């Protein structure tokens, strides 16, 4: 049971999450997560997509009230579209609420004009995210008045479910799409860790309506998944697994990382392996002169490794006290989480 209880520590864990917004808008983003165990790209990508499209909280218009109009199968004097078309257009209005309680907005317009979402009087607690969205066409000398109720919710709620709210006569319930995420797509590519090239890289494309940024939406979806899965953890970690003393070593735990986990060329990796350079600590203790005396190791390989070490503020010829430790294999595994 002890070995099984440590199973999750043997899997590679993602150590890089990159967010890239599209230049034309902050509502679209590309999210790259790597490296992942083979198969985990599809597992996480599908789970995140389903949560993003179904479980995030947002705001939407849930009902409207137009004077002298009692149902959606009516027509409004002076309005080109019938009530059903107007409702369909209203469903496309994207709103952001700064409070949890429902709010009633008002719309007043005089023709001739194209009535747009930006003409709605929202107050301080509600914001229209797509003010140019068209609601209807109003004829000359005609007036249109309307009350619109918006609420906070999640997912897609049919208008039939709104009848539970005991709407007054004349107030028409409409289908409400609360989710602030408009679209999510993902793909999985290969990525390299050391000499292994078939780990997964998860690439997600997320677009929101502006109520929440894509980065925040992804974070919220991950938190929802975390909370839902927490119940399945039916055991406790051993105390020694929880408390790893990172101050017990006279050198940085990262030096216990194996050099084959660095993204080296095959030639450089083989040279290090043939010279019995296994850990980063072994590598940084060597001088440049030592490395150039290694068989088949040239200036090109030297510069390649120097660039990689520089990314971690490391260099050749470093003084590493008490290196190598006697139980280096045990320490390398024990401090794995410290340098991941």
UniProtKB/Swiss-Prot annotation:
Protein's UniProt keywords contain Transferase: yes
One Pfam family here: RNA_pol_L
Region named Alpha N-terminal domain (alpha-NTD): 1-236
One GO cellular component term: cytoplasm
Entry keyword Nucleotide-binding: no
Assigned keywords, A-Z: DNA-directed RNA polymerase, Nucleotidyltransferase, Transcription, Transferase
EC number: 2.7.7.6
Catalyzed reactions: RNA(n) + a ribonucleoside 5'-triphosphate = RNA(n+1) + diphosphate
Domain of life the protein comes from: Bacteria
One GO process term, biological-process aspect: DNA-templated transcription
Molecular functions (GO terms): DNA binding; DNA-directed RNA polymerase activity; protein dimerization activity
Region (Alpha C-terminal domain (alpha-CTD)): 251-340
Domain notes: The N-terminal domain is essential for RNAP assembly and basal transcription, whereas the C-terminal domain is involved in interaction with transcriptional regulators and with upstream promoter elements.
The protein's role, per its UniProt record: DNA-dependent RNA polymerase catalyzes the transcription of DNA into RNA using the four ribonucleoside triphosphates as substrates.
Family: Belongs to the RNA polymerase alpha chain family.
Assembly mode: Homodimer. The RNAP catalytic core consists of 2 alpha, 1 beta, 1 beta' and 1 omega subunit. When a sigma factor is associated with the core the holoenzyme is formed, which can initiate transcription.
Protein name as it appears in the record: DNA-directed RNA polymerase subunit alpha
Gene: rpoA
